């Protein structure tokens, strides 16, 4: 059963408003030719113009050339792998580090089974899922920031 209100097109007032371009078009507008011929090309050209403008105004820096005979003191991964790198770097046993990384998805799989409430509720009324999300976000940020620091300062973030 539909709950959408259908417009009464026999109403002369509504027809006059629609003829003037006023009011909402509840009954829809066909995609051909309006969107495909007019809207989509403008969006595509605008996106292309933004990309070209960004490439011209802010070209990518190439950096210094690589020297195969000089190894850096500490090799760091890309920024999005910092938390995983910090787990592997701070735990003494490699197997323990791999198990710690594997336990993260397993813990996330268990969250819906721990919290037995309606899944369509407000997220702030689901305390377990909200707490797990906030704790996981804080731990990920802590690990990511700590990975960029030297090993002796990484766990305390250099604060203590």
From Swiss-Prot:
Q: How does it assemble?
A: The 4 large subunits of the cytochrome b6-f complex are cytochrome b6, subunit IV (17 kDa polypeptide, PetD), cytochrome f and the Rieske protein, while the 4 small subunits are PetG, PetL, PetM and PetN. The complex functions as a dimer.
Broad class of where this protein is predominantly found = membrane
Alphabetically, the GO molecular function entries are:
electron transporter, transferring electrons within cytochrome b6/f complex of photosystem II activity; electron transporter, transferring electrons within the cyclic electron transport pathway of photosynthesis activity; oxidoreductase activity
Gene3D superfamilies named among the record's database cross-references: plastocyanin oxidoreductase (1.10.287.980), Single helix bin (1.20.5.510)
Q: What is this protein called?
A: Cytochrome b6-f complex subunit 4
Give disulfide pairs as residue numbers: none
Please give a single GO biological process term from the UniProt record.
photosynthetic electron transport chain
Q: Which UniProt keywords apply?
A: Electron transport, Membrane, Photosynthesis, Thylakoid, Transmembrane, Transmembrane helix, Transport
Against SUPFAM superfamilies, the record matches this protein to: a domain/subunit of cytochrome bc1 complex (Ubiquinol-cytochrome c reductase) (SSF81648)
UniProt lists the family membership as follows:
Belongs to the cytochrome b family. PetD subfamily.
User: Which spans are transmembrane here?
Assistant: 36-56, 95-115, 131-151
